[in-house]
Amino acid sequence: MTYAVKEIFYTLQGEGANAGRPAVFCRFAGCNLWSGREEDRAQAVCRFCDTDFVGTDGENGGKFKDADALVATIAGLWPAGEAHRFVVCTGGEPMLQLDQPLVDALHAAGFGIAIETNGSLPVLESIDWICVSPKADAPLVVTKGNELKVVIPQDNQRLADYAKLDFEYFLVQPMDGPSRDLNTKLAIDWCKRHPQWRLSMQTHKYLNIP
């Protein structure tokens, strides 16, 4: 299949359980919860998204004719001769495009694969690290994985229900924006009252990591 990718870049993972880990980020274009266009935000299921996933005009972005072509670009960004290859498939919603041929090609190239998904679409069991960031008004079909990362606050959100799911790590992350300081306090207070949960911060924004 042809893969539409917004951007591909090498950096450090800034948030979640893998914060600080070097990774190639492959941001797929498109999402099933929002068109990505500002004029549609009020009608979106996810109205707080802070990511540009529209089109294929970002760094190293484009339309890739097959899995091998996409993997070649991803692999070309990893430091030459270095092991511990790791790619984060994100979006948008990566499960609109991430398929078994691409997973197989990435594994063949020596990459561990993480996915950042909203959890409303089934994921492939062959993915190495599953991070689900559920949206309160969207269906949640992925109920087990490695990491559940919940952005707070959201309307109609019930964190206590998420705690019953089958994940290794449970994280709350304060929503960015003008209320970030208040949201951070809410997240800290939640973790202190419910020790099953950990705090996730978007460290790349605080440290200006590109």
Swiss-Prot record:
Residues 18-210 form the Radical SAM core domain. Mg(2+) binds at residue 51. [4Fe-4S] cluster binds at residues 31, 46, 49. The keyword S-adenosyl-L-methionine applies. Binds 1 [4Fe-4S] cluster. The cluster is coordinated with 3 cysteines and an exchangeable S-adenosyl-L-methionine. Binds 1 S-adenosyl-L-methionine per subunit. It catalyses: 6-carboxy-5,6,7,8-tetrahydropterin + H(+) = 7-carboxy-7-deazaguanine + NH4(+). PROSITE patterns: RADICAL_SAM (PS51918). S-adenosyl-L-methionine binds at residues 48-50, 92, 133-135, 173-176. Substrate binds at residues 12-14, 27, 90, 210. One of its GO terms (molecular function) is carbon-nitrogen lyase activity. Its EC number is 4.3.99.3. Its cofactor is [4Fe-4S] cluster; S-adenosyl-L-methionine; Mg(2+). One of its GO terms (biological process) is queuosine biosynthetic process. Pathway: Purine metabolism; 7-cyano-7-deazaguanine biosynthesis. Signal peptide: none annotated. Keywords: 4Fe-4S, Iron, Iron-sulfur, Lyase, Magnesium, Metal-binding, Queuosine biosynthesis, S-adenosyl-L-methionine. Belongs to the radical SAM superfamily. 7-carboxy-7-deazaguanine synthase family. Catalyzes the complex heterocyclic radical-mediated conversion of 6-carboxy-5,6,7,8-tetrahydropterin (CPH4) to 7-carboxy-7-deazaguanine (CDG), a step common to the biosynthetic pathways of all 7-deazapurine-containing compounds. Homodimer. HAMAP family: QueE. This is 7-carboxy-7-deazaguanine synthase. It comes from Burkholderia multivorans (strain ATCC 17616 / 249). The lineage of its organism: Bacteria, Pseudomonadati, Pseudomonadota, Betaproteobacteria, Burkholderiales.
